[in-house]
């Protein structure tokens, strides 16, 4: 039925224009609201000013320095993976970092992105370490992760640390490692508060795979870093 009211047509055009120009901003606002509701529903949980304090608390109160299989996605200069290797000193722990070391694979949006293509590049240089428990796998996740998993057998509790920043990278990683996750596996997100990237990827993955979690703690401004333990 035709719209005989010019005022209605004008309002529709204005609304379409606003959504078209500011759709990403509106989606970010909606994502922030979803994140806020989720965090509120999962309280109480311990909060720490710095992420390394969160890591230390997890190892001391949950892992008790028992051996772990630690997989990190998005290594950059190695601060997190090397910190975890220093915190968890068990000789049987394994620490494996995945990164292209070429920076971000694509330029994300200007509202919730992190920089242009190539941001966080180390120009191919991997972090230096003398710890034999630590190794790095160089390349894009969609080229390296499946071949790695074909031969990988978890020996200890899994700790998955994600600092890949982008929605696509985070969702690909979570979906791909899902077969090796189980109750007790720990997931850590370094940029969880980003509503259109790590948070959205985690939410979509959890809905699709029907997983539930308990909060182990958070750190940083507005829960930038979050740690969870898988229940099912």
Annotated model-derived regions:
Residues 2-82, 86:
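Class I SAM-dependent methyltransferase Rossmann-like catalytic core
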């Amino acid at each position: 039925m035709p719209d005989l009211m010019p005022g209605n047509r004008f309002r529709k055009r204005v609304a379409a224009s606003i959504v078209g120009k500011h759709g990403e901003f509106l989606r970010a606002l909606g994502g922030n609201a979803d994140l806020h509701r989720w965090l509120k529903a999962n309280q109480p949980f311990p909060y720490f000013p710095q992420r390394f304090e969160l890591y230390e608390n997890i190892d001391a109160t949950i892992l008790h320095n028992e051996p772990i299989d630690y997989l990190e996605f998005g290594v950059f200069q190695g601060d997190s993976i090397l910190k975890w290797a220093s915190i968890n000193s068990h000789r049987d722990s394994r620490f494996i970092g995945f990164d292209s070391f070429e920076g971000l694979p694509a330029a994300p949006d200007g509202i919730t992105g992190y920089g242009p293509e190539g941001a966080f590049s180390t120009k191919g240089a991997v972090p230096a370490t003398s710890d034999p428990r630590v190794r790095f796998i160089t390349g894009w996740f969609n080229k390296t992760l499946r071949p790695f998993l074909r031969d990988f057998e978890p020996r200890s509790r899994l700790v998955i640390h994600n600092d890949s920043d982008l929605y696509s990278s985070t969702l690909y990683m979570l979906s791909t490692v899902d077969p090796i996750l189980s109750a007790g596996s720990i997931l850590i997100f370094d940029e969880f508060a980003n509503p259109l990237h790590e948070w959205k990827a985690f939410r979509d993955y959890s809905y699709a795979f029907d997983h539930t979690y308990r909060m182990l703690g958070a750190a940083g401004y507005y829960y930038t870093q979050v740690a969870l333990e898988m229940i099912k």
